[in-house]
Amino acid sequence: MFLKVQLPWNVMIPAENMDAKGLMLKRAILVELLEAFASKKATKELGYYVAVTTLDKIGEGKIREHTGEVLFPVMFSGMTFKIFKGEIIHGVVHKVLKHGVFMRCGPIENVYLSYTKMPDYKYIPGENPIFMNEKTSRIQVETTVRVVVIGIKWMEVEREFQALASLEGDYLGPLSEE
């Protein structure tokens, strides 16, 4: 789910990027904010940082004594992406294993669908392994699958989420390729 957020942030601008007219200063603040925002990746509370939408307020700059850099407190609006337990999502399979499949959903790389949560699907080994049911519905690499999220885990060191998914429910499963 995408969330609209308003966040405070501190932006450091080197002295050489300061401009008396102010126009270049606002640009320098925006560039530094975008770089810092992109490098942060995600937080447990807000999910993955996706985009800065508006720079709402630039506070008064404070000069750092030893470096000469100027610290500007800013307020901006942005978009984040976070999944929740019980949410229905679409994932694209990128790895098929005997015990389940790994999918991607937006910036989330590890959504795991266990074979125990795929009723009626059987593993078929081979060069390109798949899961198939009696109706010949297939789950294989590059298949888009509609699933329900049954668990979420925040990985602090990697700064990313992992999720567990299930096909147990109405209207869940591989989406047709029509």
Curated annotation (Swiss-Prot):
Gene Ontology process terms (BP): DNA-templated transcription initiation
Pfam families xref list: SHS2_Rpb7-N
KW Transcription (keyword) present: yes
Keyword Cell division: no
Chief subcellular location: nucleus
Localization (cell): Nucleus
Protein origin, superkingdom: Eukaryota
Family named by the database record: Belongs to the eukaryotic RPB7/RPC8 RNA polymerase subunit family.
Name of this chain's protein: DNA-directed RNA polymerase V subunit 7
Protein's organism: Arabidopsis thaliana (Mouse-ear cress)
Lineage: Eukaryota, Viridiplantae, Streptophyta, Embryophyta, Tracheophyta
